[in-house]
C-alpha cells in the first residue's frame, strides 16, 4: 500500500532532478563552444627531450650518435664563433696575482673584473711602471641599466664607504703604479652623484703619491655641470667621460637618463673649468652605427676640444644584453684611428679589444700630461704615425 507521504513527495523530487540534469547538460554545451582552443606552449627543454633519444635508443647503444654537443656545434657554426682577433690568453703572472690579492685584501672593486674586461691580463700583468688598474669607487652596483653593461644594478645601492678614499690611496701607493684610473658606477641616489667622494679620493692619492698620474672616468651627474667642475678641480690629470655610441643609437644603447648632448656638456665643462686637463671619451662599435654617424661624433668631440678618444668592439656580456650587430674588422679600427688623429685628437687607441682605460698610462699620453702640467713647450701629437693614405685623402 502506498502511503500518502510518499505520493506527496514524488512529484516535487522528480521534476527537480530532471531540471538539474537538463540545466547541467545545456550549460556544459555552451561552455564547450565558448572555450577558445589554446595551443601547447613550446619549451626548449621539453622539445629537446621529445626530439632526443628514447629509452630504447639508450638500451641499444644508439644514443651517443643522436646527441649533439653544444660546444662542438658552436665550433662547426662560424656564426656562433667569435672572430679570432677577439680571443685573448688567460690572465696570469706575478704582477697580476699581486694586484688581485691587494684588491681583495682592501675590499676594492675594479671595473676590470666587474665589467669582464678582456684586457685584464695585459693591464694587470705589466711591469709596475706600465701596469694600469682601474678602481671602481662607490660600490659595484649602479643605479642605471645600460643595455651593453654587465655591472649590477639597483635603485638603492649601499651607501659609499667613507674609508674608501683612504683605502684606495693606500693601495695605489703600495702598488707603485705610474698611472691609475678611477671609475665609478652611476649614483643617481646621491645628491651630488658622488662628485665629492671622487674628488676626495683624488686628493688622498695625490697626498700619498704625488708622482702618480690620475685619470677619473666619471658619470654625467644627471647633467649637473657644477658637479663636473668640482671633479675637474680635484687635482686629477685626465677627465674621462664615455659617450659610448653615436647620437642616433644613444636612446637604444644607454639608460634613458643618459643623453648624447648631456655627455658632451660634461666634457665641455671639464675643459672650460681647467683648460690644461686632458679630456677623454670612448666609443664602442658594433651596434649598427654608420660611418657618417661616427664621423659626426668625432666632429662634435673636436668642437668641445676633446683630446683623447678610444674605439673598441662591443661584446655582448650575457643573453640579457643587446645583440652584436656586426664584428668590426681590425682594418676598420685602424682607419678610425688614423682618421681621428688627422682630425686633431692628441691620442687615439683603436682596436677590437680596446676599452676606455686600455693602456691609459702609455708613455705618450704621460708625456702630454706632464708637459701640460708644467706648461713646457708645445703639446706633442701622434701625427707622425698617421697613415699617409688618410692624410692624402683629406688634402
Curated annotation (Swiss-Prot):
Give start and end of each Radical SAM core domain: 127-346
Record-level GO cellular component terms: mitochondrion
- UniProt EC number: 2.8.1.8
Q: Which UniProt keywords apply?
A: 4Fe-4S, Iron, Iron-sulfur, Metal-binding, Mitochondrion, S-adenosyl-L-methionine, Transferase, Transit peptide
Q: Which CDD domains match?
A: Radical_SAM
What pathway does this protein act in?
Protein modification; protein lipoylation via endogenous pathway; protein N(6)-(lipoyl)lysine from octanoyl-[acyl-carrier-protein]: step 2/2
Keyword match Nucleotide-binding: no
Q: SUPFAM superfamilies from the entry?
A: Radical SAM enzymes (SSF102114)
Q: Which PANTHER family match?
A: LIPOYL SYNTHASE (PTHR10949), LIPOYL SYNTHASE, MITOCHONDRIAL (PTHR10949:SF0)
The entry assigns this protein to a family as follows: Belongs to the radical SAM superfamily. Lipoyl synthase family.
Supply the name of the protein. Lipoyl synthase, mitochondrial
> What is the organism of origin for this protein?
Debaryomyces hansenii (strain ATCC 36239 / CBS 767 / BCRC 21394 / JCM 1990 / NBRC 0083 / IGC 2968) (Yeast)
Amino acid at each position: 500500500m502506498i502511503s500518502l507521504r510518499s505520493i506527496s513527495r514524488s512529484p516535487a523530487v522528480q521534476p527537480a532532478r530532471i531540471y538539474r540534469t537538463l540545466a547541467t547538460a545545456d550549460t556544459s554545451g555552451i561552455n564547450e563552444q565558448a572555450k577558445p582552443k589554446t595551443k601547447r606552449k613550446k619549451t626548449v627543454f621539453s622539445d629537446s627531450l621529445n626530439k632526443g633519444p628514447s629509452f630504447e635508443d639508450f638500451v641499444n647503444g644508439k644514443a651517443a650518435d643522436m646527441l649533439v654537443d653544444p660546444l662542438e656545434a658552436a665550433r662547426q657554426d662560424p656564426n656562433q664563433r667569435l672572430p679570432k682577433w677577439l680571443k685573448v690568453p688567460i690572465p696570469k703572472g706575478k704582477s697580476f696575482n699581486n694586484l688581485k690579492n691587494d684588491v681583495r685584501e682592501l675590499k676594492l672593486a675594479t671595473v676590470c673584473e666587474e665589467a669582464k674586461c678582456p684586457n685584464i691580463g695585459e693591464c694587470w700583468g705589466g711591469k709596475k711602471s706600465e701596469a694600469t688598474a682601474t678602481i671602481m669607487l662607490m660600490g659595484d652596483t649602479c643605479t642605471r641599466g645600460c643595455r651593453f653593461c654587465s655591472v649590477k644594478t639597483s635603485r638603492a645601492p649601499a651607501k659609499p664607504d667613507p674609508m674608501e678614499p683612504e683605502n684606495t690611496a693606500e693601495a695605489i701607493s703600495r702598488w707603485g703604479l705610474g698611472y691609475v684610473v678611477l671609475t665609478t658606477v652611476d649614483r643617481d641616489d646621491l645628491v651630488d652623484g658622488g662628485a665629492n667622494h671622487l674628488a676626495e679620493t683624488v686628493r688622498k692619492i695625490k697626498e700619498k703619491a704625488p708622482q702618480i698620474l690620475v685619470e677619473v672616468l666619471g658619470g654625467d651627474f644627471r647633467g649637473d655641470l657644477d658637479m663636473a667642475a668640482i671633479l675637474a678641480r680635484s687635482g686629477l690629470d685626465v677627465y674621462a667621460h664615455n659617450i659610448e655610441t653615436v647620437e642616433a643609437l644613444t636612446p637604444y644603447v644607454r639608460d634613458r637618463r643618459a643623453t648624447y648632448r648631456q655627455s658632451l656638456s660634461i666634457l665641455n665643462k671639464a675643459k672650460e673649468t681647467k683648460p690644461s686637463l686632458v679630456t677623454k671619451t670612448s666609443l664602442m662599435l658594433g651596434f649598427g652605427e654608420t660611418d657618417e654617424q661616427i664621423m659626426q661624433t668625432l666632429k662634435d668631440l673636436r668642437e668641445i676640444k676633446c683630446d683623447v678618444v678610444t674605439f673598441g668592439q662591443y661584446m655582448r656580456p650575457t643573453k640579457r644584453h643587446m645583440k652584436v650587430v656586426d664584428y668590426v674588422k681590425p682594418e676598420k679600427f685602424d682607419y678610425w684611428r688614423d682618421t681621428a688623429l688627422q682630425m686633431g685628437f692628441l691620442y687615439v687607441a683603436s682596436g677590437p679589444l680596446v676599452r676606455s682605460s686600455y693602456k691609459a698610462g702609455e708613455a705618450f699620453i704621460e708625456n702630454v700630461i706632464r708637459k701640460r702640467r708644467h706648461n713646457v713647450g708645445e703639446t706633442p701629437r701622434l701625427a707622425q704615425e698617421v697613415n699617409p693614405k688618410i692624410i692624402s685623402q683629406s688634402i
